[in-house]
């Protein structure tokens, strides 16, 4: 009887390496697949692709599996990076890892793996898949400190039915122990924290290679000009560092934060104090929705939600089509609203709002706007909250 073939996405890191070893130990026919998805600066100081491939080959030799490299750079640029730039140009702050998972790791990679006669694919993500009553559920990882279900919330039933997450039941500390015990050459390699497939580099410098600067005024909520920004695309909601107001004599001495953008006037609004009302939101609207089960929760469903990675689930109520918030948008896309029990800090357009029912990840959408802590005011990528000077 032939062994079941599993193709493992191997990055050269510890997690995917241990994933491949675990599956080999469990008796699977394991094939490693290294994805090359970025080519713009292969010889640059921040590109680790060459060393990552060397690490993959070394690990494959040690555990005794075949490995190959596949180039998805064109797919990545078309499906992920182009959207990444469009979102930043529109003043939003996208999460490319979410789109990369849906379009590259679990679409282009999955398709290629199936062409290699694989029954399943596996990655080193910290999450779990559970089959129940003929349906597949995406669950949080056993190690909640490493849970990556937030980045995987756009996976559908077809993708989950072919996916294994061997590390979902294992704490990260144990993964490191396994790597050391079996003598993996990359056992002490640090975890990657850079943009998906682009690596760790000064982000503003990287973005400026593709988007031009466009200076404009930096204002307070009452309309006072306190500085100049280099371009709205280079700032994100809640940002504190890199604003350029650290030595400013304006204000009360509290730290400054980015609070809103007005695309029409090219104005960046900043506020002082971590808990300023312009930074706090109890409601949001999200579009470009995706549900793991293929359908949304019931209107009025009480759930938890994350508006950024590693955030604790925030209690909220889901508003579907019955509330009017999920009505079709300009492009015919569904929307949903979330009403939170407690105010959320710096809810950022372009980021994902991901819903949970306990351990189960339900799916989510891309944040379009959020109501601020001040009644009747909201902030989106293109509009600041109602200004004091306009009252």
Curated annotation (Swiss-Prot):
Gene3D superfamilies: Adenine nucleotide alpha hydrolases-like domains, HUPs, Translation factors. The keyword ATP-binding applies. Residues 95-97 are annotated as: Interaction with target base in tRNA. It catalyses: S-sulfanyl-L-cysteinyl-[protein] + uridine(34) in tRNA + AH2 + ATP = 2-thiouridine(34) in tRNA + L-cysteinyl-[protein] + A + AMP + diphosphate + H(+). Keywords: ATP-binding, Cytoplasm, Disulfide bond, Nucleotide-binding, RNA-binding, Transferase, tRNA processing, tRNA-binding. InterPro entries: MnmA-like, MnmA-like_C, MnmA-like_central, MnmA-like_central_sf, Rossmann-like_a/b/a_fold. It is found in: Cytoplasm. One of its GO terms (molecular function) is tRNA-uridine 2-sulfurtransferase activity. ATP binds at residues 9-16, 35, 124. The keyword Disulfide bond applies. SUPFAM superfamilies: Adenine nucleotide alpha hydrolases-like. The active site is at 100 (nucleophile), 196 (cysteine persulfide intermediate). Residues 146-148, 308-309 are annotated as: Interaction with tRNA. The record marks 125, 351 as: Interaction with tRNA. It is an enzyme of class 2 (transferase). Its main location: cytoplasm. Its EC number is 2.8.1.13. One of its GO terms (biological process) is tRNA wobble position uridine thiolation. Disulfide bonds join 100-196. GO terms for cellular component: cytoplasm. Catalyzes the 2-thiolation of uridine at the wobble position (U34) of tRNA, leading to the formation of s(2)U34. Belongs to the MnmA/TRMU family. NCBIfam families: PRK00143.1, trmU. This is tRNA-specific 2-thiouridylase MnmA. It comes from Burkholderia orbicola (strain MC0-3). The gene is mnmA.
């Amino acid at each position: 009887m032939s062994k079941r073939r599993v193709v493992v996405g191997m990055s050269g890191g510890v997690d995917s390496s241990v994933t491949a070893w675990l599956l080999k130990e469990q008796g699977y026919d394991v094939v490693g697949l290294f994805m090359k998805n970025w080519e713009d600066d292969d010889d640059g100081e921040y590109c680790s692709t060459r060393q990552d491939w060397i690490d993959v080959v070394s690990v494959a030799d040690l555990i005794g599996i075949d490995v190959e490299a596949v180039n998805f750079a064109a797919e990545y640029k078309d499906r992920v990076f182009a959207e990444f730039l469009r979102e930043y140009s529109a003043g939003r702050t996208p999460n490319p890892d979410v789109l990369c998972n849906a379009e590259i790791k679990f679409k282009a990679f999955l398709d290629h793996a199936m062409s290699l006669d694989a029954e399943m694919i596996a990655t080193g993500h910290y999450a779990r898949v559970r089959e129940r009553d003929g349906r597949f559920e995406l669950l949080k990882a056993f190690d909640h400190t490493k849970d990556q279900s937030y980045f995987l919330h756009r996976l559908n039933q077809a993708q989950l039915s072919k996916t294994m997450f061997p590390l979902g039941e294992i704490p990260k500390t144990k993964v490191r122990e396994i790597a050391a015990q079996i003598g993996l050459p990359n056992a002490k390699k640090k975890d990657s924290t850079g943009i998906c497939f682009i690596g760790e580099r000064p982000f503003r410098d990287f973005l400026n290679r593709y988007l031009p600067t466009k200076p404009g005024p930096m204002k307070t909520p009452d309309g006072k000009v306190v500085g100049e920004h280099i371009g709205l695309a280079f700032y994100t909601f809640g940002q504190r560092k890199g604003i350029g107001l650290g030595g400013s004599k304006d204000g009360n001495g509290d730290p400054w934060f980015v609070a809103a953008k007005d695309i029409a006037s090219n104005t960046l609004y900043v506020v002082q104090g971590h808990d300023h009302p312009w930074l706090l939101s109890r409601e949001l609207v999200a579009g470009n929705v995706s549900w793991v089960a293929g359908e949304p929760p019931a209107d009025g469903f009480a759930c938890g939600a994350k508006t950024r990675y590693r955030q604790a689930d925030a209690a909220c109520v889901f508003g579907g089509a019955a509330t009017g918030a999920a009505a079709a948008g300009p492009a015919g896309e569904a929307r949903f609203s979330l009403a939170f029990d407690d105010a959320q800090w710096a809810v950022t357009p372009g980021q994902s709002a991901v819903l949970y029912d306990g351990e189960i990840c339900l799916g989510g959408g891309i944040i379009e706007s959020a109501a601020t802590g001040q009644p009747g005011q909201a902030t989106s990528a293109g509009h600041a909250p109602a200004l004091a000077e306009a009252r």
